[in-house]
Amino acid sequence: KDAGIPVITVDRMVDVSDDSLYESYVGGNFLLEGQKAAEWLKAYADAKGITELNIAHIQGTIGASAQIGRTQGLEEAAEKYGWNIVAQQTGEFTQAKGQEVMESMLKQHDNINVVYCENDNEAFGAIDAIKAAGKTVGPDGDILVISFDTVKAGIEMTLTGDIICNVECN
């Protein structure tokens, strides 16, 4: 600021008391992403006659703007529609932690039918854990997997049905 160099934040918002420290933010509306994913889940569940949703929520890194918005979108919908968030833990936006967390959740809750992962890496790990536990994913499977970011491998897993809904960050 003192040097007169404009700062533009990309992909993550910053929480500062002086908004004049940066000129602009370029990135996704993470709350809207969470709301859109929840709207999709509601419509899908209604169309398929799924009356009870027991959701395992694998959060991103706690405090990250993507985690805050995507979590808020899910929690608002869960309250509005009476969905059960049976487990909630950070996967730190990584595949390894996503797998570890999903393994733990599956051991503690045998009624999970949706996993809401706040990015694709977490979803990849969660899917590995689900399959290792002898359960299936996809539209005809035991557990529906929702994800965000649609990286190349995420798109491929959405096309195969392993990820049932993948929300793009743009």
Tell where the protein language model's regions lie, with residue ranges.
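A residue-level marker of the well-folded mature domains of exported/periplasmic proteins
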Residues: 1-170
